[in-house]
Amino acid sequence: MAQNLDLQTFTDPRGNLTVIEKIIPFEMKRIFYIYGVDSSVRGGHRHHKTVQAAICIKGSCTIYCNDGENEQVFDLTAPHQCVILEPKDWHTMYNFTPDAILMVLASEYFDKNDYIFEPYGDN
């Protein structure tokens, strides 16, 4: 089941500093980011092995997750919010604002055989 984390953020008159350390439950092997999204829905898959951490570092977006038993919706509206997606979490990302940048940290290197595109059936 996906989980929402609050990343530690330090704020002073100079601005904000958000830290990603000792909170992500895996060793990062890959980082990618999604931006310039129109009204399209991204994702639409789950994984065999990969765990992911999704952070909307600019703008906002929504993440829908279904682990085969429970459905969850996360609205990422601030850069200190992080959603951990387990391999079994079939997920889509949508409602991107025009300025949105969604950064994703992954536990595995890209492997097309790690993707499962079939969604779970109705609960």
Residues of each region from the PLM?
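Non-catalytic, conserved peripheral segments adjacent to functional cores
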Residues: M1-V83, P98-S107, D111-Y120
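Short beta-strand-centered segments at strand-helix junctions
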Residues: L85-K88
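Surface-exposed, Lys/Arg-rich phosphate-binding patches that contact polyanionic backbones
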Residues: H91
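Asparagine-centered strand-capping/turn motif at beta-strand->loop junctions
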Residues: Y94-N95
